[in-house]
């Protein structure tokens, strides 16, 4: 992330931040960019149906300079098949975080503004 800006508040350094025009996207995989596949059925992950609008939109954001990180409830043992699927389908991205808590009903608590976007993949 070479676009990070170092900031100071009251003469003390704080965590670096991205410029205002660059966004940090955290994107779910199952049910968001492809079929919703549970961890209990990993054999389906390699052949998941891609949501074409997701590929077009996310790659556009990447090309605009935004950071794309997939944040999935898939477990670490499914990393290789997940990376292969993302790459074979042409997704451009910076990172992949595994092990997001399952079950939905998420509430995000942070010291930064968090915006949510409901992306209808189908």
Listing of model-derived features with the role each one plays in the protein:
Residues 1-122:
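HAD-like aspartate-dependent phosphatase fold
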């Amino acid at each position: 992330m070479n676009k990070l800006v170092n900031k100071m508040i009251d003469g003390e350094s704080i965590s670096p931040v991205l410029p205002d025009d660059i966004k940090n996207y955290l994107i779910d995989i199952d049910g968001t960019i492809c079929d919703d596949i549970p961890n209990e059925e990993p054999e389906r992950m390699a052949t998941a149906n891609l949501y074409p609008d997701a590929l077009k939109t996310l790659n556009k954001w990447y090309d605009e300079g935004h950071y794309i990180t997939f944040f999935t409830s898939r477990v670490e043992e499914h990393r290789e098949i997940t990376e292969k699927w993302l790459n074979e389908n042409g997704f451009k991205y910076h990172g992949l975080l595994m092990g997001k808590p399952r079950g939905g009903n998420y509430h995000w608590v942070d010291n930064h503004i968090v915006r949510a976007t409901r992306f209808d993949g189908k």
